[in-house]
């Protein structure tokens, strides 16, 4: 009887130990998967912005930081920081293209000296197994080209949001030109992640002190970004 009791205790302890190991492994695996990031940095003096960095995590969290003037004639403002959730479709494309680009291991720049400078770019990948990056001006690699386009389009969208927020506070008549340009760029598929600037678009769309044509444009952009204003 006592032997059976000891055996049962040992079996129970073994089972508990195995469950503990499984739990630790599951937590480690989940942490490893969620820690993967792809980032893009651009430094291009005299452009607007002259520097920005965008990092996307495999869990959908994204961070954007930029410096530079709002317009060519304005004074340099404080650095701009924004955190948002990237759409699943864009996140999937980013990590898929990173894999196709072999996670930026090795050289990706064309190495050609007769290509005009479009800014110093850095693509980087980080997870539990890799920590790689590649610097380039122009790359002939199709996956790198796709990533460059995606990140630049996201930056353009977020910089629109930055200017819209400023104009909404200090120069409301300037909103119309910005919103009109945004609509045109959406049609030409030159913007990504419109939902990231939905808060300022909602503020404009519901602000009675903004002219109607600008409010209507903001409403259309919200609908295109998948966050239409609810009708009352």
Per-segment meaning from a language model:
Residues 88-111:
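Charged, amphipathic alpha-helical segments
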Residues 12-23:
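Bacterial N-terminal signal peptides
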């Amino acid at each position: 009887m006592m032997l059976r009791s000891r055996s049962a205790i040992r079996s129970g302890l073994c089972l508990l130990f195995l469950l503990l190991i499984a739990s630790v492994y599951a937590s480690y695996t989940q942490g490893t998967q969620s820690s993967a990031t792809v980032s893009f940095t651009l430094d291009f003096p005299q452009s607007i912005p002259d520097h920005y960095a965008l990092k996307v995590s495999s869990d959908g969290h994204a961070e954007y930081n930029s410096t530079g003037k709002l317009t060519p004639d304005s004074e340099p403002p404080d650095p701009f920081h924004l955190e948002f959730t990237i759409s699943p479709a864009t996140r999937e494309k980013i990590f898929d293209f990173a894999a196709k680009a072999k996670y930026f291991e090795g050289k990706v720049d064309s190495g050609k000296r007769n290509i005009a400078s479009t800014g110093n770019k850095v693509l980087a990948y980080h997870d539990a197994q890799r920590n790689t990056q590649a610097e380039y001006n122009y790359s002939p690699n199709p996956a790198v080209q796709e990533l460059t386009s995606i990140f630049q389009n996201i930056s353009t969208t977020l910089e629109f949001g930055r200017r819209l927020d400023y104009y909404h506070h200090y120069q409301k008549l300037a909103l119309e030109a910005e919103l009109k340009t945004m609509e045109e760029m959406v049609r030409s598929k030159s913007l990504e992640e419109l939902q990231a600037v939905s808060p300022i678009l909602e503020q404009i769309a519901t602000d009675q002190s903004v002219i109607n044509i600008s409010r209507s444009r903001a409403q259309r952009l919200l609908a295109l970004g998948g966050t239409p204003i609810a009708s009352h």
